[in-house]
């Protein structure tokens, strides 16, 4: 953290095909080893496949999937008097998006389909229908926060 001034957050340019900042962020999450064009191909193919199967707009499917995966609460470890408590905390909107995207990509990578585009399309469709591994991850996080609600007064 700089001491002199607060550094502003860098503005992300919207993606070229759909002109969406959310999609540009998602492309950056998928990208590995700086291969952005490969990541774009994967995402566009996945969105096309999902759009054909569900006959909805590309961005509508992505937004619905993200909405069902974004966590509203999470637990953070807090040490109090020699013991560690899992304290439930609300998740800020930027982190909410980041976690949702990360969980979607992780779930897609673990799937069994042949190409990454098909895996991602399958996970996006599952998430938009409120099922799938990424949604299960969010439910687990929410369940953990609910179970540790008694420690909410340790929040900082």
From Swiss-Prot:
Annotated signal peptide: none
| Any one GO cellular component localisation term in the record | small ribosomal subunit
Please name the PROSITE patterns in this protein's record. Answer: RIBOSOMAL_S7
> Under which name does UniProt file this protein?
Small ribosomal subunit protein uS7
How does this chain assemble? Part of the 30S ribosomal subunit. Contacts proteins S9 and S11.
CDD domains in UniProt:
uS7_Bacteria (cd14869)
Ranges in a coiled coil: none
Which terms does the UniProt entry file under GO BP? translation
What is an example of a GO molecular function annotated in this UniProt entry? tRNA binding
Note the NCBIfam families from the entry.
Answer: rpsG_bact
Q: What PANTHER family does the record tag this protein with?
A: RIBOSOMAL PROTEIN S7
| Assigned protein family | Belongs to the universal ribosomal protein uS7 family.
Function, please?
Answer: One of the primary rRNA binding proteins, it binds directly to 16S rRNA where it nucleates assembly of the head domain of the 30S subunit. Is located at the subunit interface close to the decoding center, probably blocks exit of the E-site tRNA.
Keywords from UniProt, A to Z, are: Ribonucleoprotein, Ribosomal protein, RNA-binding, rRNA-binding, tRNA-binding
Q: Which InterPro entries match?
A: Ribosomal_uS7, Ribosomal_uS7_bac/org-type, Ribosomal_uS7_CS, Ribosomal_uS7_dom, Ribosomal_uS7_dom_sf
Pfam families the record matches: Ribosomal_S7 (PF00177)
């Amino acid at each position: 953290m700089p001491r002199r001034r607060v550094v502003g957050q860098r503005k992300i340019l919207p993606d070229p095909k759909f002109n969406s900042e959310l999609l540009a962020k998602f492309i950056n999450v998928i990208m590995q080893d700086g291969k952005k064009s490969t990541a774009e191909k994967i995402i566009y193919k996945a969105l096309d496949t999902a759009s054909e199967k569900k006959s909805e707009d590309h961005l509508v499917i992505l937004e619905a999937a993200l909405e069902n995966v974004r966590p509203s609460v999470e637990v953070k470890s807090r040490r109090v008097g020699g013991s560690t408590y899992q304290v439930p905390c609300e998740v800020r909107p930027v982190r909410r998006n980041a976690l949702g995207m990360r969980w979607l990509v992780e779930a897609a990578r673990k799937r069994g389909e042949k190409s990454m585009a098909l895996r991602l399309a399958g996970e996006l469709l599952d998430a938009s229908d409120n099922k799938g591994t990424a949604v299960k991850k969010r439910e687990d996080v929410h369940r953990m926060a609910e179970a540790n609600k008694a420690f909410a007064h340790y929040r900082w």
